[in-house]
């Protein structure tokens, strides 16, 4: 039996990447994917809502990612068509966002 090779640093002698780096890269990919399918103003409004609610915290980032994943899943289930959701022709794109309960 041979032993498993020991892990060594990359050839350029940079330190190995942290597991969190992969999470950040995956998150950026999801945001880029959301930008392909949703109006950027809608995503900015969502980001502002999450920021107002959670501030600049990891919990807020997780909440934003969770909402984006759900929205993309529903969007793809409904049949994508690569249109930008929330961007009605000639109207305010933010009017497509339902008013939250308790804010009426």
UniProtKB/Swiss-Prot annotation:
Annotated spans, Disordered: 1-21, 84-104
Complex formation:
Interacts with human UNG.
GO terms classed as biological process: symbiont entry into host cell; symbiont-mediated arrest of host cell cycle during G2/M transition; viral penetration into host nucleus
Keywords, A to Z, come to: Activator, AIDS, Cell cycle, Host G2/M cell cycle arrest by virus, Host nucleus, Host-virus interaction, Modulation of host cell cycle by virus, Phosphoprotein, Transcription, Transcription regulation, Viral penetration into host nucleus, Virion, Virus entry into host cell
Q: Which residues carry this modification: Phosphoserine?
A: 83
Classify the main location: virion
Q: Please give the name of this protein.
A: Protein Vpr
Claim: Transcription is one of the keywords in the record: yes
The UniProt regions of compositional bias labelled Basic and acidic residues, in chain numbering, are: 10-20
Top-level taxon in the UniProt lineage = Viruses
**Taxonomic lineage from the root:** Viruses, Riboviria, Pararnavirae, Artverviricota, Revtraviricetes
The species is: Human immunodeficiency virus type 2 subtype A (isolate ST)
Q: GO CC annotations?
A: host cell; host cell nucleus; virion component
Pfam families named among the record's database cross-references = VPR
Tell me where it resides.
Answer: Virion; Host nucleus
Its function, per the record, reads: Stimulates gene expression driven by the HIV-2 LTR. Prevents infected cells from undergoing mitosis and proliferating, by inducing arrest or delay in the G2 phase of the cell cycle. Cell cycle arrest creates a favorable environment for maximizing viral expression and production.
